[in-house]
Amino acid sequence: MNEKIETITREIQKLKEKTFKVFFFVYNTKGVPSGSLTYIYQTASYLKELGYNVQMLHTEEDFQTPETWLNNVDVASLPHLNIQKEKIEVSASDFLFIPEIFADVMAKTKEMPCKRVAILQNYDFMTELIPVGASWNTLKIHDCVT
């Protein structure tokens, strides 16, 4: 019981001190501008400016950051991690933001201890890309931002 209390106390302290992690799952546009990715990077950059520990997650070997076309965001200041190559440690106080187009990521991360939040930018994708018989609820996504 004491171990659980210590863990809870540690996670609460991370929230108070802004040392928890805020992950954003992003996709590779290969240099092509994207409005939805602009929103994600602007949000991530703003949170970093406020002192939060922001990290961008992706899965591609040849991932290109959007700094060639995204001029109003300091993309270089945001760490980019390839989740297929690097070990990502996630705790209960962390947040993972997942664009609605990544139902597969929602499914693969549903047992993670962090708070997972969908980023809904296109209403059509909310149900179109989710597996048959699944819902955000069955994928343990209970919150979204638009």
What residues fall within each predicted segment?
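N-terminal pre-catalytic "stem/leader" segment of glycosyltransferase-like enzymes
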Residues: 1-95
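Extended catalytic core of nucleotide-activated donor transferases of GT-like folds
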Residues: 9, 63-142
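Active-site capping/gating segments
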Residues: 146
